[in-house]
């Protein structure tokens, strides 16, 4: 009996779907069947396993779930029930708030945990504001809309929530919050204390597909001599029912005209579909199709996710069994074999995955002072205004992902003092370090430098690109730092070949480059350079012509929003490509609140940490007294722990160490991240540098102090 006479296995299709619909689906021509779907049939599309970013308008948008908690609610208003309403705003206008959702009513108390979670779409390149409004509720099913019933409000930026690295943010409650204070990053000091809120965000469970590949061997043919059929297979998930089992269709392979040793392409299955239970049975049908499109059945086999996870080998070589042939022939063994040749659990990490796991963004700025023609005062003022707007637009977003808000700034294309030699790479602040404190520090350095330098007629951008590339390689542990360099130019660039080489080198660095052309100059050569295919490993550069984004008839915030969206749109994609090329996986999210009450017991190993902010400004002038441990012991001033100030970016910028009454005072800014990234050994080394390693509390030998002239040395550290 030939295979053409063999009937398909007994129909065990899901009872919730139409059998006729599935019959029509399987009897359709192959090319049409793969392009259409049936209601109730979940088909996992066969796509490339190489991680890639979508090309939508907002390619790196992610959904987060926001939850709100009130602590120490101190309002004088009376209420029996209270609700929380969330509004979002992407503008600077107070009348543009749109409602996100409303929580269910909660009984009024000093500490309220709203169990409802608000789903929100996060976009990196946008300034997104969230306003939480807490109001009394008179009707259980309808919150009050009157302004008199509003008890407190709080406004925060979504960037601050994501950039807090613990996905948790603390804010003070206000009676009437405004957008200006939220955008400035400072909270107003009010006479009336209303309490605070804790804003937490969670990322929904992400899709983690599995990649599978099968090869066949000696599969039965329709005709032994004149066989022109193509062989393929279908994957089903087997679900057990009360009456009978059902099959859920998952995937269908391509058809190959090779029965002896077909090698199908790898395909992807969603873990939720194929492995909701590790021992969930997967039934695979091996079939053939002739030139007329008619299909026939060869056999089937069963497997599970847990078994395939062992990988290629003898455990994953399956016999294809045809139940009809097996019942008719006693000598029947199988209708061929199927072998698993690839099985991979794939995790596609997104930009948000890396940010919440601790990756910091750093912003570097390069300003080109050159001009091919003499600049009039009016043109210079326009250039300064556009430069200020562009730096503010881009920097106001990136700064929320920068813990210390320090930005490196460079000058290009000018004669610099004191010798007034030509330079295309100098620090904008004319210091030994290019770091400026905040965006205000960058603009102040630019204004001072503008009065001190003489512009050139042409410039070179490659020196600054190479400098920042080297700086990004030295920024710390791989995967924890990513840099964004913005180059502002209005003149003629003469080193296009060197720029191309610098961009190729930067493709291996954690760096994205934004070249922003300003004014009416012809930037066609730079546009062509940035748009053509690079020899590097990934795309790192984007060109933006600022004039095409500005509209004088619109409000300034609209121009700023347009600049930020255009300039930063591809930065998440660049960062994800770098992480994937470097095989850097995102770590689990850091579950730490970046608040002034940040707890870091790891600063001194094996010592409990106590926080007393009232003692921060009460440092003794002579020495450090420890009455609780050694009542009669006064340590000399040379043993007092003094933070080092000679290293920029070290933890001494955030720490104020004071050993008094057995306590350690720690000052950490809200978005500080360096503490959690430093290993135990590094902190011990840093404590030695600051002099703390010479003391070990609470054991201090008085005889040691007397014999050593006031110095204590413990060999155990």
From Swiss-Prot:
GO terms for molecular function: calcium-dependent phospholipid binding. It holds the Pfam family Copine. It comes from the Eukaryota. InterPro entries: C2_dom, C2B_Copine, Copine, Copine_C, vWFA_dom_sf. One of its GO terms (cellular component) is plasma membrane. One of its GO terms (biological process) is cellular response to calcium ion. Belongs to the copine family. This is Copine family protein 5. It comes from Caenorhabditis elegans.
């Amino acid at each position: 009996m030939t295979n053409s006479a063999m009937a398909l296995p007994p129909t065990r299709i899901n009872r919730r779907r139409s059998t006729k619909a599935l019959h029509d689906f399987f009897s359709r021509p192959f090319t049409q069947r793969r392009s259409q779907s049936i209601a109730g049939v979940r088909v996992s599309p066969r796509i490339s396993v190489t991680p890639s970013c979508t090309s939508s308008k907002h390619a790196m948008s992610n959904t987060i779930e926001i939850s709100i908690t009130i602590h120490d609610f101190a309002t004088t208003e009376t209420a029996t029930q209270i609700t929380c309403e969330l509004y979002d705003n992407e503008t600077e206008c107070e009348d543009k708030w749109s409602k996100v959702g409303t929580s269910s009513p909660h009984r009024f108390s000093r500490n309220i945990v709203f169990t409802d979670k608000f789903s929100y779409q996060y976009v990196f390149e946008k300034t997104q504001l969230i306003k939480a409004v807490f109001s009394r509720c008179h009707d259980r099913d309808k919150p009050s809309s009157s302004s008199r019933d509003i008890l407190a409000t709080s406004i925060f930026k979504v960037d601050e929530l994501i950039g807090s690295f613990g996905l948790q943010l603390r804010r003070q409650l206000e009676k009437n919050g405004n957008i200006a204070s939220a955008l400035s990053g400072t909270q107003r000091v009010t006479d009336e204390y209303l309490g605070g809120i804790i804003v937490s965000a969670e990322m929904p469970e992400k899709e983690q597909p599995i990649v599978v590949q099968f090869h066949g061997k000696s599969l039965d043919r329709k005709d032994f001599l004149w066989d022109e059929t193509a062989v393929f297979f279908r994957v089903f998930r087997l679900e057990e029912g009360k009456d009978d089992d059902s099959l859920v269709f998952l995937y269908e392979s391509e058809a190959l005209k090779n029965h002896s040793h077909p090698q199908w392409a790898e395909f992807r299955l969603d873990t939720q579909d194929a492995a909701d239970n590790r021992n969930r049975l997967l039934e695979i049908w091996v079939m053939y199709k002739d030139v007329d499109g008619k299909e026939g059945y060869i056999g089937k086999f069963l497997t599970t996710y847990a078994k395939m996870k062992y990988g290629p080998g003898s455990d994953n070589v399956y016999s294809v069994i045809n139940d009809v042939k097996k019942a008719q022939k006693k000598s029947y063994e199988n209708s061929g074999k199927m072998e698993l040749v690839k099985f991979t659990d794939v995790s596609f990490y997104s930009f948000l995955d890396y940010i919440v796991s601790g990756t910091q963004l750093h912003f570097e700025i390069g300003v080109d002072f050159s001009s091919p023609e003499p600049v009039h005062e009016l043109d210079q003022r326009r250039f300064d205004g556009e430069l200020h707007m562009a730096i503010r637009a881009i920097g106001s977003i990136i700064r929320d992902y920068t813990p210390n808000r320090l930005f490196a700034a460079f000058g290009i294309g000018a004669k610099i003092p004191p010798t007034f030699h030509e330079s295309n790479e100098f620090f904008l602040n004319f210091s030994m370090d290019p770091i400026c404190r905040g965006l205000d520090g960058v603009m102040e350095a630019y204004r001072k430098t503008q009065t001190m330098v003489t512009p050139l007629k042409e410039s070179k951008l490659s020196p600054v690109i190479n400098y920042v590339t080297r700086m990004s390689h030295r920024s710390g542990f791989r995967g924890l730092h990513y840099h964004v360099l913005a180059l502002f130019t209005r003149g003629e660039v003469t080193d296009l070949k060197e720029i191309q080489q610098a961009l190729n080198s930067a493709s291996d660095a954690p760096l994205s480059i934004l070249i922003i052309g300003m004014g009416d100059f012809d930037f066609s050569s730079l546009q062509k350079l940035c748009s053509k295919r690079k020899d590097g490993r990934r795309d790192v550069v984007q060109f933006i012509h600022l004039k095409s984004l500005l509209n004088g008839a619109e409000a300034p915030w609209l121009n700023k929003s347009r600049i930020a969206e255009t300039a930063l749109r591809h930065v998440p994609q660049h960062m994800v490509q770098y992480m994937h090329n470097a095989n850097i996986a995102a770590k689990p999210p850091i579950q730490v609140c970046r608040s002034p009450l940040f707890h870091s017991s790891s600063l001194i190993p094996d010592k409990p940490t106590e926080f007393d902010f009232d003692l921060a400004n009460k440092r003794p002038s002579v020495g450090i007294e420890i009455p609780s441990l050694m009542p009669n012991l006064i340590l000399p001033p040379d043993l007092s722990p003094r933070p080092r100030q000679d290293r920029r970016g070290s933890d001494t910028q955030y720490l104020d160490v004071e050993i008094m009454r057995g306590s350690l005072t720690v000052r950490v800014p809200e978005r500080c991240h360096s503490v959690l990234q430093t290993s135990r050994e590094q902190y011990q080394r840093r404590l030695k540098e600051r002099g703390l390693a010479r003391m070990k509390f609470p054991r201090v030998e008085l005889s040691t102090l007397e014999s050593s002239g006031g110095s204590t040395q413990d060999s155990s550290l």
